[in-house]
Amino acid sequence: MPRICAGPPSRGTPRWVKIWIAVWKNRLKPYDLLSKDEVNTIHEQAMTILEEIGVDFLHDGARELFEKAGMRVEENRVRFERAFVLEQVARAPATFELQARNASRTVTLGGDNVVTAPVYGPPFVTDLERGRRGATIEDFTNFDKMSQAVEQIHCAGGTTVEPEDLPLGTRHLDMVYSHLRWTDKPFMGSVISTEGARDTIEMASIALGGRDKIEKTPAIISLINVNSPLRYDDRMLGALFEYSQAGQPVIVTPFLMAGAMSPMGLAGTVAQQTAEALAGIALVQLIRPGTPSVYGSFLTNTDMQSGSPAFGTPESAMGILASAQMARHYKLPFRGGGALTSSKAPDAQAAYESMMCMWPTILGRVNFVLHAAGWLESALLASYEKFIIDVEQLRMFEWILGHGLPVDEEGLAMDALREVGPGGHFLGAEHTMRHYRTGFYRPWISSTENFDRWQRFGSRTTEVVAAERWKQLLAEYPDPGIDPGVDEELKTFIARRKTEIGADA
């Protein structure tokens, strides 16, 4: 639940000013891009796709479960009965808790809750001084520490960057350890393999009090990507089985670039996405009924001149809104949106493309916002400065959701209107004196000073200020600590698993 900042309010703080620092509640009315008839039309097409075309599952266990449930299975292809799909999807809870190592950081997904997480997946990182380079485990840990340090990030994320200085076969152990040691927030599990998922579950069990405890209240959320169009590969399905059997939430996310991996028509793309997501969620429920399942969306268009994905486009924005509406139709928590951009630098393009994705994220009532901070270059690049700039944007949305527009005695300020009257000004009014410190949003890095003052203090651009801020965050990082016995048990487990896997795997 959201918390009001601890301690007494500062002098002049009105009762209606709330500082939301744990998780967001989005009480804005969701924006419906589609009519009810259009939602039903897309639903019908999704069901037709599942019935007539089907979905490939490159995993023996998945096909066996579907065949046992009465679905038509031919080689890798599974064709579904719509009643079966809808029955299974209805087993997934509309809301669920995701526990953190620190109980006060536990979050709720679904409903009007908004949970944010940083960038996921880039093999490269950049900062103002060192430029673009391959990511390392030091970078990974730094992003964990920055995520811990800012209240606007609620989940530490998963593969914030790919630490290329570590062996591929064992790096997931170091990454999960970083999440558990340097943050006390919820985190995302490894999906690189069946074994990676199994190791994640074991490490979370060590850190959070045992397998029984995390099965009772989930502690790991994982990102299961569909190999669109209409195919699940064995690696993702192996991870899906492990997490589902343990009752850990999965975000089933088709990766759709309209024009390449889905039709040019955006409505057809949303229908394909719905079919793919519901097929995966049906499998999760077959494995363990009631396992939390999230309808995920990663939908944008292809630049038809270059073949590259394009982010922060009108299609991205409409895709977020339409996808969120479909998730609400099935009463499922929804993942989508984020501060997405195709820009290679934290520049004006990055800013307007990110905002083009973040506004529909908020208006569409997205529940889990992956890539909320740090994303550049179509997910190839994580930027220290972009992380900070995105957090400023998150702070603004946090203010809108937490502060709102109070229509009460203080918000209407009739006393100030009477005091000032025609032709006056409100700078010295009693109402202004009560609220001037806390009544408006105060920027974290943005400049609102006049030109002379800005020039006198170095004419610093936003990127320069952001570089100073991330260094300050790391220098002042609030270490959450960890029980020494738990830490030792985690390190022992990691050492054993690295020996079993092989250091050069």
Which residues fall in each region the model found?
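Histidine-centered active-site loop/cap adjacent to the catalytic His
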Residues: 2-16
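Conserved active-site and cofactor/substrate-binding residues in soluble primary-metabolism enzymes
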Residues: 11, 37, 41, 57, ...
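N-terminal leader/transition segments
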Residues: 11-12, 18-127, 469
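Catalytic-core signal marking the mid-to-C-terminal active-site face
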Residues: 19, 33-45, 53, 58-65, ...
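Short acidic (Asp/Glu) and glycine-rich catalytic loops that position anionic groups and cofactors
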Residues: 21-26, 67-70, 219, 257, ...
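Catalytic alpha/beta active-site cores
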Residues: 79-254, 258-263, 267
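Glycine-rich anion/phosphate-binding loop at the beta-strand->alpha-helix junction
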Residues: 223-393
